[in-house]
C-alpha cells in the first residue's frame, strides 16, 4: 500500500493538468467569498496548507499577497514552485507533513492574516485546527467535499458487475461534521456554507481505465483482470472520437472561523 506522500505524488500530474485549465467559476466564487467577507485583502499574508500544485497560491500572488505553500508531496511542491515562478511578490513553498510541524517554526513566526486548506486531509482534528489557528491572526478556512456523485463511474461499475463505491475512505458528511466539532472543541465559533461544485473530466478510454485502476482496482488481488475488463467495457461506452465525459456533481462545505473570536 502506498504511503500518504506516494499517494499524492501519484496524482500530481492530474492536479497540474487541472491547474493548466485556468480559473473556473468555483475558484472565482471562492475568491469572491474571501474578499466579500473581509478574509482576503491585497497584500495580506496567506498560508495554504496542503496546497497541491499551488493553484490558489497563484491566484493569491496575483493579488499581491505574501504566500506560503505547504504540502506533503514533494512532486506537488516541485510543480507549485514552477507555477509560482512568474510572480515577484513574496512566496515560499515547503514540502512537509503538517502533522510533524509545531506551527512555531521560524518561517511561521510572523503569522498569517488568512490560513486556508482546500480539499486536503492536513486539517483533520482538534490538534491540527489549533495549530492552524495559532499561526493565524485572522481567518481560517477549510473546504471539504460534503457530497460526491459520479454517474459514469457508477454505470461502468454496474456494467462490470461491481457495486459502485466512493473514492473517499470516510463518509464525507461525517468528515465535515468532525471538522466543525474540532473547531468548536478548539474554542472557536465555526461557520459553514455549502456550495455546489460540478465539472466534467474528458478522458480517453486508456485514461479512464487508468483512473479506475488507480482509484478502485489497485488494492484488489484481481486488479489486472479488472483493468482489462474495464478497458473492454469502456471501448463500447465512449463517443465516436474514443472519448468519455466523466461528469462529477458535488457539494462542498466551506468551514471557517475567526481566530480572534473565541467562545
Per-region residue spans from a language model:
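Conserved class I S-adenosyl-L-methionine
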Residues: 1-40, 43-52, 141-163
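Class I SAM-dependent methyltransferase SAM/SAH-binding core
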Residues: 53-100
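A short SAM/SAH-binding and catalytic strip from SAM-dependent methyltransferases
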Residues: 112-127, 146
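A short glycine-rich, Lys/Arg-flanked "PGG" loop and its adjoining helix->strand segment in the class I
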Residues: 126-141
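Short alpha-helix
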Residues: 171-187, 192
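Conserved Class I S-adenosyl-L-methionine
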Residues: 191-263
Amino acid at each position: 500500500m502506498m504511503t500518504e506522500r506516494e499517494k499524492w505524488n501519484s496524482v500530481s500530474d492530474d492536479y497540474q493538468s487541472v491547474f493548466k485549465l485556468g480559473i473556473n467559476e468555483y475558484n472565482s466564487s471562492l475568491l469572491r467569498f474571501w474578499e466579500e467577507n473581509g478574509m482576503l485583502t491585497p497584500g495580506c499574508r496567506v498560508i495554504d496548507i496542503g496546497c497541491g500544485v499551488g493553484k490558489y497560491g497563484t491566484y493569491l500572488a496575483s493579488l499581491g499577497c505574501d504566500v506560503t505553500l505547504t504540502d506533503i508531496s514533494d512532486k506537488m511542491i516541485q510543480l507549485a514552485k514552477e507555477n509560482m515562478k512568474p510572480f515577484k511578490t513574496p512566496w515560499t513553498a515547503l514540502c512537509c507533513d503538517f502533522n510533524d510541524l509545531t506551527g512555531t517554526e521560524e518561517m511561521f513566526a510572523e503569522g498569517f492574516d488568512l490560513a486556508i486548506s482546500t480539499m486536503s486531509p492536513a486539517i483533520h482534528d482538534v490538534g491540527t485546527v489549533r495549530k492552524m489557528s495559532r499561526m493565524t491572526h485572522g481567518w481560517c478556512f477549510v473546504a471539504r467535499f460534503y457530497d460526491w456523485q459520479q454517474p459514469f463511474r457508477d454505470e461502468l461499475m454496474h456494467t462490470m458487475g461491481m457495486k459502485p463505491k466512493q473514492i473517499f475512505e470516510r463518509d464525507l458528511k461525517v468528515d465535515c461534521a468532525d471538522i466543525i466539532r474540532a473547531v468548536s472543541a478548539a474554542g472557536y465559533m465555526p461557520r459553514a456554507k455549502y456550495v455546489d461544485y460540478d465539472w466534467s473530466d474528458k478522458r480517453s478510454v486508456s485514461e479512464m481505465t487508468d483512473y479506475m485502476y488507480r482509484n478502485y482496482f489497485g488494492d484488489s488481488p484481481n486488479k489486472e483482470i479488472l483493468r482489462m475488463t474495464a478497458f473492454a467495457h469502456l471501448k463500447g461506452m465512449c463517443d465516436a472520437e474514443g472519448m468519455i465525459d466523466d461528469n462529477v456533481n458535488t457539494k462542498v462545505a466551506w468551514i471557517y472561523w475567526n481566530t480572534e473570536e473565541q467562545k
